[in-house]
C-alpha cells in the first residue's frame, strides 16, 4: 500500500571510479550518484528524492564498501527485484550488493561514525593495475613510514593535508599504517572524517618520509604547521579506495 509517508532504504554498493567524475551528481559529467538516480527514476518514480551517499568521493576514486540511502513511499518495496533490475541497468563498474529498509533516523553520511580508506602503491609495473594502483618503482622505508603514520593518530588539525580551508579541520584518526602484500604497498587509514584531498596528500608526504627526503621531525613540523604548502605531493586519485564505512550497531545493515 502506498502512502504519503516516506520510508528510508539503504544501499550497499561498490564501484570503480576511473570513468566517473566522483560521487556527486553533475550536469555535464558521469557520476556514481547520477547513474543510480537514473535507475531509481526508471524503476520507481521520476519524483524520487535524491539518493544520499556516505561521502563525496573525488573523480577517479574507487569504493569497496560504500553506503547510500534513498526514500520511497512504499515500505513494502520489493528490494530483491529492485536490486536485480538496478544491477542490469547500471554500468559494469557499479554493483549494488544489497537494498534494505532502515529506520527513519538513519542518514548515510551523518550517521557514520568512521570511514576507512586504503591507498594502493604497486612496486611492479602491471598493465592489469592501470587506473587501480599507483606505480612507484623507488625503494621505500616502510618502517619509517609507519613511525610517521603513528604520529597522525588522535585528534589532529589536518589542514596541512588539505587543499581546502575549513572552519574546523580537526579529525580523529583512529588508525594509520602501511603493510605489504606481494608487490603492493597498502596504506590504511580510519577516521571520523576526512578533509578534501587529505588521504592523497598524507600518502604523498609519507612517501617523502620513505624516500628519506624528510625525517620524522620534519613530518611532525608539517602536521603542526597547518600549512598545505609544507606537505608533500598528492598521489593520483586512482590508487585510492573507500574500503568501509562504520555505523552505530543499532542500524542492522
Describe the residue ranges of each PLM region.
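Structured-RNA-binding interfaces characteristic of tRNA pseudouridine synthases
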Residues: 1-253
